């Protein structure tokens, strides 16, 4: 029986085959006519790629059917290298949770009276509970940048 093979260039080749012929035999006949090696050939019929071990009758290829020949693509995506870091990644700082941390701001004396150890910021932007940092020579509010500097008597 006669089948047609349409190449990528649009040229149609006529082949004389039998329904019992394998796809490998068809590819060998295409190599004889066109010079394309069988390992680079891909034959498509009815939207399916034809496998080498099967016969034309397995795919229901009848007389005057048209197969489409496309070339196999070599290679693929370029292999990417895994990044190697010379220095280890910096560990993100985790804030330490201290239970009952508010107790360090207050002190209870022997009479049961509560005294503040830190000064609250009197600024309008800062509400109640915003304490000023106690430095050696000043109190400083980190929220509104208010600073109270202590004046020490000069030693003579």
Curated annotation (Swiss-Prot):
Site feature: Interacts with activating enzyme: 54, 72
Q: Which GO terms describe its biological process?
A: cytoplasmic translation; modification-dependent protein catabolic process; protein ubiquitination; ribosomal small subunit biogenesis
SMART domains with a match to the protein in the record:
Ribosomal_S27 (SM01402), UBQ (SM00213)
Write down the position(s) of the site called Essential for function: 68
InterPro entries in alphabetical order: Ribosomal_eS31 (IPR002906), Ribosomal_eS31_euk-type_sf (IPR038582), Ribosomal_zn-bd (IPR011332), Ubiquitin-like_dom (IPR000626), Ubiquitin-like_domsf (IPR029071), Ubiquitin_CS (IPR019954), Ubiquitin_dom (IPR019956), Ubiquitin_ubiquitin-like (IPR050158)
Q: Which Pfam families would you find in this protein's record?
A: Ribosomal_S27, ubiquitin
The UniProt entry's GO CC annotations, sorted and at most eight, read: cytoplasm; cytosol; cytosolic ribosome; cytosolic small ribosomal subunit; nucleolus; nucleoplasm; nucleus; small-subunit processome
Chain ranges of the Ubiquitin-like domain: 1-76
The answer to keyword Glycosyltransferase applying to this record is no
Q: Which UniProt keywords apply?
A: Cytoplasm, Isopeptide bond, Metal-binding, Nucleus, Ribonucleoprotein, Ribosomal protein, Ubl conjugation, Zinc, Zinc-finger
C4-type zinc finger locations on the chain: 121-144
A further note on this protein reads: In Drosophila ubiquitin is encoded by 3 different genes. RpL40 and RpS27A genes code for a single copy of ubiquitin fused to the ribosomal proteins eL40 and eS31, respectively. Ubi-p63E gene codes for a polyubiquitin precursor with exact head to tail repeats. For a better understanding, features related to ubiquitin are only indicated for the first chain.
Q: Which family does the entry's similarity section mention? A: In the N-terminal section; belongs to the ubiquitin family.
* Record PANTHER family: UBIQUITIN
Q: What is this protein called?
A: Ubiquitin-ribosomal protein eS31 fusion protein
In the UniProt record, what gene is named as encoding this protein? Answer: RpS27A
């Amino acid at each position: 029986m006669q089948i047609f093979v349409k190449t990528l260039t649009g040229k149609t080749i006529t082949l004389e085959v039998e329904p019992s012929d394998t796809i490998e035999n068809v590819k060998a006949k295409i190599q004889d006519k066109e010079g394309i090696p069988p390992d680079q050939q891909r034959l498509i019929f009815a939207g399916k790629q034809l496998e080498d071990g099967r016969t034309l009758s397995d795919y229901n290829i009848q007389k005057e059917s048209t197969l489409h020949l496309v070339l196999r693509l070599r290679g693929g995506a370029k292999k990417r290298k895994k990044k190697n870091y010379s220095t280890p990644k910096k560990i993100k700082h985790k804030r330490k949770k201290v239970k009952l941390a508010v107790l360090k701001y207050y002190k209870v004396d022997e009479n049961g009276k509560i005294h503040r150890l830190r000064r609250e910021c009197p600024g309008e932007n800062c509400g109640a509970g915003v304490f000023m940092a106690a430095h050696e020579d000043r109190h400083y509010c980190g929220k509104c940048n208010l600073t109270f500097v202590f004046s020490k008597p000069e030693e003579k």
